[in-house]
A protein has these predicted regions:
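Active-site-adjacent structural elements that line small-molecule/cofactor binding pockets in enzymes
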Residues: 1-299
Length: 299
């Protein structure tokens, strides 16, 4: 197998599930079933609000249409995952993705640290810049500043989680010297993984993150992106650090061979899910994943 970057976090492929349209009273049960099936992680989506009128183009559909109806139910991901944490023991808890520039970093740091402590160090902060200008307008934040805000927020989060005192005098994050306790179990090593497909997004993941979340790739396109990220990691002097590649796969596509193909292409994990995957498909999907994950090639 061709190794496309110096360090791989795992010696075998991992499989997670992305539960995008599941209600809270169903989420815990599905997460428990996923844990029993051998899945390593459960991921939930996040938006603060859903605008009534959306002119922004959704970047992961050719027609730019929003991925879900405007009346979709939205829940706080940290509260949802807290419920999952209380009823599971090993499955990791991720956001896919949390719109990082919309929040004060103190609020984000506290929510993430609390869940990481509650879960025994199982949180993955999947983060993105956001794609809806209307969502930022509703929150009173300039959409054009989201990348610059992210660049300031990430170092502050890591400092709050690891240092005795944190301060910041950035353009967007101004913070006098403060104490932040308790720290999450992994401190500054709590993983922050970035979504996004643009060149800027890939560089951001390599520069600031511990991983990348890819959307709707093939093994061939994954191989190309992983090679590019590997070159960026080397450019930023991070070539010897753990960096986790996760790629989204539709529930209808997942098979043992698909998992193997993505792993050989450089992905550490496939995340099975879809923005519109109906509730009725998940029992069958989880049963299928249980079979796939018991195959000799994945054990």
């Amino acid at each position: 197998m061709v190794v496309l970057r110096p360090v791989r976090p795992y010696s075998k492929p991992k499989v997670g599930i992305w539960l995008s349209v599941v209600e809270p009273d169903q989420l815990v049960g599905f997460a428990q079933d996923a844990e029993l099936a051998g899945c390593d992680s459960v991921w939930v989506p996040e938006h603060l609000i859903w605008p009534d009128v959306i002119r922004s183009k959704y970047p992961y559909r050719d027609d730019g249409a929003p991925p879900v109806p405007s009346a979709v139910n939205l829940y706080d991901p940290w509260v949802l995952l807290g419920g999952v944490a209380s009823k599971t023991t090993t499955i990791r808890l991720g956001t896919c993705v949390y719109v990082l520039p919309l929040r004060d970093p103190l609020v984000t740091a506290r929510a993430v640290a609390t869940l990481d402590i509650l879960s025994g160090g199982r949180v993955i902060l999947g983060a993105g810049l956001g794609w809806m200008a209307e969502e930022f307008a509703a929150a009173g934040i300039d959409f054009r500043t989201r990348a610059a805000r992210c660049d300031e927020i990430v170092p502050v989060l890591r400092s709050l989680w690891s240092n005795e005192i944190t301060s910041s005098n950035g353009r967007f994050v101004k913070l006098p010297p403060v104490h932040f306790n308790p720290k999450p179990p992994r401190g500054a090593k709590l993983p922050i993984v970035f979504g996004g497909e643009s060149e800027h997004a890939l560089r951001r993941a390599a520069r600031l993150g511990n991983g990348w979340l890819g959307t709707w790739h093939t093994p061939e396109s994954t191989r190309d992106v992983v090679a590019r990220i590997g070159s960026y990691l080397a450019e930023y002097g991070r070539g010897d650090e753990d960096f986790e590649i996760t790629v989204m796969v539709s529930p209808r596509e997942v098979t043992e061979q698909v998992v193997v193909d993505f792993y050989q292409a450089g992905a550490d994990r496939i995340c099975v899910g879809s923005p519109r995957a109906p509730l009725r498909v998940w029992p069958e999907v989880l049963e299928k994943l249980g079979t796939v994950l018991q195959s000799p090639a994945l054990r």
